[in-house]
Amino acid sequence: MSKLTKRQKTIGDKIDSNKLYALSDAIGLVKEFAVAKFDESIDVAVQLGIDAKKSDQVVRGAVVLPNGTGKTKRVAVFAQGAKAEEAKAAGADIVGMDDLAAEIKAGKMDFDVVIASPDAMRIVGTLGQILGPRGLMPNPKVGTVTPDVATAVKNAKAGQVQFRVDKAGIVHGTIGRRSFDTAKLQGNLAALIDALQKAKPASSKGVYLKKVAVSSTMGVGVRVDTQTIAA
């Protein structure tokens, strides 16, 4: 059996993997052991009490984190006429229709979010095999297919994150960076949990928020007492 490194032993001494920590303490521990030479993201994993195999229990949505994500997102918008001008005024980085679709088909995808007005979906629909696997396909369920493209752009720029439960019933998300103070990370996680609560399927029975854990990009995971997450 290999010996534990000094760092692993220190983590083992300070973090009990079976203990539920108050949110502020959990975040403090994650930040303490996030020692990479870059500003690590602070991530969360939420185990939901749903059956992800059932179509009526797929949890999906979007939420604007009140304190942002620490990352500036580039936004592409499919719109024309007045809607295109509204998108540009709201801060969209790329706006187009057939010309934007041609760039995407050519492999030029210098953006993190794609938004579309409903009338543009005839064009966007042809890009499903390109955008879909990358998680970029616009969808009305997360507010990225909408006649109000300006608000969608502003939300994306303000720190909106999308979430979707995986096959194991877990939602993964990022709530900020190590450089964020604890209060901002707490506020962002509370907003995400509130959005998950609102997205609870009517057919879900029993405990809905089963487990919550926070971690950093290269660091350790710490379990959170859900009773300490104030929405």
Swiss-Prot record:
Q: Name one GO cellular component term.
A: cytosolic large ribosomal subunit
Q: List the disulfide bonds.
A: none
Organism placement in taxonomy: Bacteria, Pseudomonadati, Pseudomonadota, Betaproteobacteria, Burkholderiales
Presence of keyword Ribonucleoprotein: yes
List the InterPro entries hit by this protein, alphabetically: Ribosom_uL1_bac-type, Ribosomal_uL1, Ribosomal_uL1-like, Ribosomal_uL1/biogenesis, Ribosomal_uL1_3-a/b-sand, Ribosomal_uL1_CS
Q: Name one GO molecular function term.
A: structural constituent of ribosome
Check the UniProt entry and state the signal peptide residues, or none.
none
Query: Quaternary structure?
Result: Part of the 50S ribosomal subunit.
- Record GO biological process: regulation of translation; translation
Provenance organism: Polaromonas sp. (strain JS666 / ATCC BAA-500)
What is the annotated role of this protein in its UniProt record? Binds directly to 23S rRNA. The L1 stalk is quite mobile in the ribosome, and is involved in E site tRNA release. Protein L1 is also a translational repressor protein, it controls the translation of the L11 operon by binding to its mRNA.
**Per the similarity annotation, which family is this?**
Belongs to the universal ribosomal protein uL1 family.
Q: Which gene encodes it?
A: rplA
For this UniProt record, give its keywords in alphabetical order, as a comma-separated list. Answer: Repressor, Ribonucleoprotein, Ribosomal protein, RNA-binding, rRNA-binding, Translation regulation, tRNA-binding
Q: Has keyword Cell inner membrane?
A: no
Record SUPFAM superfamilies: Ribosomal protein L1
Please state what the protein is called: Large ribosomal subunit protein uL1
